[in-house]
Amino acid sequence: MKAKKTLCAIVAILVAILVGGCLYLDSLMPIITGYAAKNLASAVFVSGREQADVEGLDLNFSFIRYTRNRVDRKARTVTSRFLWRKATAVYRDGWGVTLLRGGRLADLQAEPYPLAPAVAVPERLTHGNPALTLRLEPIATKLVDEHAYNGTPFAFVVLHEGKLVAERYRAGMDEGTKLLSWSMAKSFTNALVGIMARDSLVDVFAPMDIPEWQGDGRRAITLSDMMQMQSGLAWNEDYGNRSDVNLMLHR
């Protein structure tokens, strides 16, 4: 009888561990499938890369490498599956790639993109400082062509005093290839907001007009606070687990 009770207890513990593991894994699956679908769709439909190249370089880590991905070039969608979960991302002109979370794909595809007035900008940057370009050539070669610093860089571009002094791209890519910027977008956004502040188009020290914040202390948070990451809001940006940033981006 004692042995039977012990066996039952062991089985119960193992079942509890199995159920707990499945529940935890299920909570991660929207992130796993969402990450794969969104990033593969952006790489294929925005950057013009091949599926196999993206899966071998960009998606070859953690659970992401085990997703099964289907690219539908006619519908311009990517569906990624992992075990019993799946996610679909759709490319739309102007909008780029969007994860489908609820709703109908046809409704999302039919949503119009509001075109803004075109702004004239220089098509190309001017080159300058040949001596500096010459000094950077060995670095560009080692980084992009020889992969001497680990990883697989897609592009190496250096600006100095507004002039282009170094430019090298991975095979199959050039200055027209659109690439995922990750946190580099923060620098671009800060620069654009700085231009708007200079031209009195925005007051970065005014409280942000977010309706959900008006009933508590968050109503005092300014755009400057947000841009300098000093808002005081609790935020977990660990990309390795079920964090705030992963839930925001991929769930």
Where do the language-model regions lie?
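A short, well-structured edge-of-sheet supersecondary motif
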Residues: 79-80, 137-173
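Alpha-helical transmembrane signal-anchor/signal-peptide segments
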Residues: 27-49
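Membrane-embedded, hydrophobic transmembrane alpha-helices
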Residues: 34, 46-94, 102
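N-terminal Sec-pathway targeting helices
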Residues: 1-27
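Active-site SXXK
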Residues: 161-162, 179-205, 226
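Non-catalytic propeptide/linker segments at domain boundaries
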Residues: 81-148
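A small/polar active-site loop signature that marks catalytic segments
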Residues: 231, 235-251
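Active-site helix/loop module of the DD-peptidase/beta-lactamase fold
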Residues: 198-234, 238
